[in-house]
């Protein structure tokens, strides 16, 4: 397995979308969109996955790859045309994403979800909880998960998923994990504050709050939580130092997300869509390239 040729352990940044290789990969994965104008952090995650797997020699039509919380994202169909096998796992048909990218029909008719022709013989789709992966130890050459870890529950549940991802990786295997990271967490968006609000309201508000679990900004991880609940429990090695800095221009179009789902970009234009404000805090995507020791 070869080494990484570029910076992957980083936060999503507007400058990334000026990189010719990244733009070329996005044109291949999403040919119907212009990546120069459709600047979005979710497709950045696709590019990070595709480029890192290419760097590491995994796009060899032999590698066995597991997608955790895979939904029906087009990257899994793209991978079937380039690796030996893709196992897509999710709680299909249940959970918060059942009506979106994790519909139950993915289990019975994945071809209906495919945006382009793919190697159907290389795709296996299974209902599976990320905290209890039903595969033997050391089953996969690579595992990926894109913006899913933070949705698995409280910190203890993320720990379990991280351990399971490491368990099913073969020695020397790679996990490419993307998650929502809080670049700025307001002091009021803290677990003790949410827990106090829950207590004062006699449990009628912020019902999911706990000693270590936020309620208002629950589905994003702080840098410390990435370390404590993803990297350390997995026992995997971060392949590069993590860079969470973003350029000033990336902050120009922070999109405010309201509880009812409304989105309000600072400039009035949806793109670039890289930073999201939830309540008083701001998040984006982060990429973690991890390797299991030999």
Locations of regions flagged by a protein language model:
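A C-terminal cap/extension of S-adenosyl-L-methionine-dependent methyltransferases
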Residues: 239-294
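A short acidic, Gly/Pro-enriched loop at the edge of an enzyme's catalytic core
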Residues: 128-143
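A short SAM/SAH-binding and catalytic strip from SAM-dependent methyltransferases
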Residues: 141-156
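Class I SAM-dependent methyltransferase Rossmann-like catalytic core
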Residues: 2-59
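A short glycine-rich, Lys/Arg-flanked "PGG" loop and its adjoining helix->strand segment in the class I
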Residues: 159-171
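Class I SAM-dependent methyltransferase SAM/SAH-binding core
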Residues: 66, 73-132
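Short alpha-helix
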Residues: 213-241
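Conserved beta-strand signature within the Rossmann-like core of class I S-adenosyl-L-methionine
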Residues: 172-180
């Amino acid at each position: 397995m070869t080494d990484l040729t570029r910076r992957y352990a980083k936060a999503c940044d507007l400058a990334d979308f000026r990189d010719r290789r990244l733009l070329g990969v996005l044109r291949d994965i999403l040919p119907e969109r212009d990546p120069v104008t459709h600047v979005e952090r979710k497709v950045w995650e696709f590019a990070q996955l595709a480029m890192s797997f290419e760097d590491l020699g995994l796009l060899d039509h032999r590698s066995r790859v597991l997608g955790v919380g895979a939904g029906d994202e087009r990257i899994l169909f793209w991978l079937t045309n380039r690796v030996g096998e893709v196992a897509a796992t999710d709680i299909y048909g249940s959970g918060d994403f059942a009506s979106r990218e994790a519909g139950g029909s993915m289990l019975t008719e994945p071809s209906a979800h495919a945006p382009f022709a793919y190697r159907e013989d290389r795709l296996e789709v299974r209902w599976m909880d990320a905290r209890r992966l039903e595969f033997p130890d050391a089953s996969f050459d690579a595992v990926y998960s894109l913006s899913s870890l933070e949705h698995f529950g409280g910190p203890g549940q993320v720990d379990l998923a991280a351990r399971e991802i490491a368990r099913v990786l073969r020695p020397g295997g790679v996990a490419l994990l993307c998650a929502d990271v809080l670049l700025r967490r307001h002091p009021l968006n803290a677990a003790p504050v949410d827990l106090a609000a829950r207590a004062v309201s006699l449990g009628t508000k912020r019902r999911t709050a706990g000693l270590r679990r936020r309620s208002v900004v629950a589905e994003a991880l702080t840098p410390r939580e990435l370390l404590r609940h993803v990297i350390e429990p997995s026992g995997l090695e971060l392949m590069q130092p993590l860079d969470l800095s973003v350029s000033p221009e990336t902050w120009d179009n922070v999109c405010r997300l309201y509880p009812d789902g409304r989105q309000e970009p600072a400039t009035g234009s949806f793109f670039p869509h890289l930073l999201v404000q939830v309540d008083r805090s701001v998040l984006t995507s982060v990429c973690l390239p991890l390797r299991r020791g030999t």
